Amino acid sequence: DHAGIATQFRVEKKIYDEKKLHRGEYSREYFLEEAHKWVESKSGTILSQLRDMGSSLAWKDTYYTLDEKLSESVIAAFIKLFDEGLIYRSERLVNWDCALKTAISDAEVEYITLTKRTKLNVPNHKYPQYPFGVMAHFYYEICDKDGKKTGEKVEIATTRLETMLGDTAVAINPKDARYNHLHGMYVWHPIREVPIPIIQDEILVDMNFGTGVVKVTPGHDPNDYEVYKRHPEIGLISILTPDGAIAPGYGQFSGMMRFDARVEMVKWMKEHGLYKEEKDHEMRLGITQRGHDIVEQVITPQWFVNTTDMAARAIKAVDDGELKIVPDEFVVDWKKWHENIRPWCISRQLMWGLRIPAYRVQIDGKWAEGNGEWVAAASQEEAIAKGAKANNVVPSRVTVEQDPDVLDTWFSSALLPFSGVGWPSNEERLNRYFPNSILETGWDILTFWVSRMVMMSLTLTNKVPFHTILLHPLVRDAQGRKMSKSFGN
């Protein structure tokens, strides 16, 4: 397995340790050359260790997820899903690693619980540590749509003060009589110097919790993004650059790393009489596995798989007895996961991995629009032909540009039960070895890997990839931690 983000992190660290070069100081070609050398050395170790353990395996069938045959399978799957409308490009909230400057999967996020004010290290920032587990209380001043202030304030509480830069509304519960007089009113955003609306939202706001007034930051919070979908008139703003600095347009805070901006915003609000207090607050904080950075939620254009119908088929396979999960206590988790499934983000802003086989189309030097803007193809020549057909023009008017992003490792991993035995070209071998009888794996990747193998297999082959899923407990180290490349254990 080429192990995408984990491998890139290790190779970048190796390059820095040996050459003192950071990403951005060397070319993609140089990185890939170093990565292939590192992979070759580790592959030999992996195979020798398997032999030393007495593994009885079909050594002649060893494959690597970036070799030519596997890559062809992955590209074929992407094209088929794209052409069927199941893969699409959209701007949505994703987990973002500011240190690595890429979208990451839920599997690459580890959560810690803070019971009180706790100082943590954050990469690429000014100070050694920053406080978390703190609820900051500040004020917004009430105004009309023209920004004329009434003299009244509302109190807002947040654990992420810096995100107020991206607030596009504050919300109240329509049943909360305390705020009836604020219906149709606005609050003054003191840093952007604009009025933002007070909206009514019964789903977001519990009027019996806190002050009953909630900031709404659709560009950086999943719950607030849902508010935006219910109230699209409020709009959304992304306040961060890819490396986690405050974007231009936010006064003196622009250019600061996000948690440095938080520190300075507290001082600024105190000077302007807008900061009330801060209190210890229990919270759950997402940390990136690789760079140990604080995970951000950001809106970026990415590639997604529409998994809604796939998930329904995965549930049905278990209900019908076609797929058995052992121990059966995990059936509840299986159903809960698939009933609440979200679109799967499959693009990564990395150098290591299989480049996404999607091409953006230009007609006479101008970007195409609508359904003809992007095509999926196995080559540039095929992309030009598809782009011409999609836009009803002759190929000579078409140029294409391949997306620079790479596919999520989990995408290629999801195809392994059939891509590893010849799909889609070697039908004889596929019929001999697919579907498998049993998958034996750790319970911790039931949703990240097993679920996706089942969904991809049902969608692309119309068969379950195996008939039994046998889940084992986890082997842990002396400190109780699971085996992890990021822990080095």
Curated annotation (Swiss-Prot):
Top-level class of the enzyme under EC nomenclature: ligase
InterPro entries per UniProt: aa-tRNA-synth_Ia, Rossmann-like_a/b/a_fold, Val/Leu/Ile-tRNA-synth_edit, Valyl-tRNA_ligase
Gene3D superfamilies: HUPs
Chain span(s) of sequence motif 'KMSKS' region: 482-486
Gene Ontology molecular functions: aminoacyl-tRNA deacylase activity; ATP binding; valine-tRNA ligase activity
EC annotation from Swiss-Prot or TrEMBL: 6.1.1.9
Keywords: Aminoacyl-tRNA synthetase, ATP-binding, Ligase, Nucleotide-binding, Protein biosynthesis
Binding site for ATP: 485
An individual GO BP term: valyl-tRNA aminoacylation
GO CC aspect terms: cytosol
Reactions catalysed according to its record: tRNA(Val) + L-valine + ATP = L-valyl-tRNA(Val) + AMP + diphosphate
Classification via Pfam families: tRNA-synt_1 (PF00133)
Entry's family note: Belongs to the class-I aminoacyl-tRNA synthetase family.
Protein name according to UniProt: Valine--tRNA ligase
Organism for this UniProt entry: Trichomonas vaginalis
Taxonomic lineage: Eukaryota, Metamonada, Parabasalia, Trichomonadida, Trichomonadidae
